[in-house]
């Protein structure tokens, strides 16, 4: 029988634990409710700050590639994960991994990485180049651009989560 339960930590983080006995894999996904449609945030002093479009997408890459222990994907690969990635949507950013073995070791590395990021200007510049490359590739994808233009005509909220190259 499948079971789901929510746990709320002292810091307010809510965790959903869902057990599905029909699966042989373990899936962990962490969501932050900060995505491509967010252009401001509230700092620890309660002040609202403006940010550039694409910031959530840039942070998605930055966090994944620059933990205090290095690249999160590379660190998890050592434990034979099935896959690992991050993604930015309009309303949220998520990070995940799937594994069959070494679940607790992978979970520890994953959480340590996500919550312990190493910031520097050089790392930020390198990450920006990767994001610019992704934006350029997206602009050159004719099929996606046709779909995006069609969706633009159907919906009023039509911002890309990738951001721009500016």
Model-identified regions with their sequence ranges:
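N- or domain-start disorder-to-order transition segments that initiate the globular core
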Residues: 1-26
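Short beta-strand/turn micro-motifs at beta-sheet edges
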Residues: 15-18, 82-85, 150
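M16/MPP (pitrilysin/insulinase) zinc-metallopeptidase core fold and M16-derived inactive scaffolds
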Residues: 27-109, 159-165
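Scaffold signal of the M16-like zinc-metallopeptidase fold and its non-catalytic homologs
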Residues: 62-67, 113, 138-166
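Short, flexible active-site-proximal loops enriched in glycine and acidic residues
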Residues: 83-89, 103, 119-125, 142-146
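Internal, well-ordered alpha/beta segment that forms a basic, Gly-enriched binding/recognition surface
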Residues: 94, 98, 133, 138
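Acidic/histidine-enriched alpha-helical segments
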Residues: 117-136
